[in-house]
Amino acid sequence: MKGVVMFPDKVLRKKIEPVKKIDKKTLREIEELKIILQESENGAGLAAPQIGVNKSFFGIKEKGGVRMLINPKLIAVYGEKVYPKMVDNEGKESDFLEGCLSFPDLFGTVKRYLKIEAEWEEVKNGKLESRNKTMMGFEAILWQHEYDHLLGILFVDHIKEDGGKLYLWKGEEKKKISIDEVLKKEK
């Protein structure tokens, strides 16, 4: 079984191919991604390029398992991109820090739409069936993050473009680091 591909592996920037038919190989790749995501402690989503597969699908953890989204498309966005916030149990607000399994211990502030509409396909009885949904909050943020992977866009690209903050977070220690230091590893 494959593992999660780490930055700066070039497969993370590759243009993916749509899934045209559900054959044994594709079903095996989908199942493999699903297992890797289920077994990951910190992952909320995982895209095919992150396991070295050049196909258009990703998985999102939900209550009761992993939903696999095939050939996803972003249909509409609502409002403006913003830096999402979190509120803890005491009502204290802080920046929502986005992470990625391909960037262990790195987290950053990423501008995202808080409401989106999307469509995709799911495998049912060996065939692809269409789905669509309007999503808000964390679900919308997660969907955009995984969808970006299919376009070769990484969360650090948004941080660089929008001037967000990037942190190295190991255990209890969190320190701000330079986005340029991370991106220069790609060269």
Q: Which residues does each PLM region occupy?
A:
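Positively charged
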Residues: M1-K187
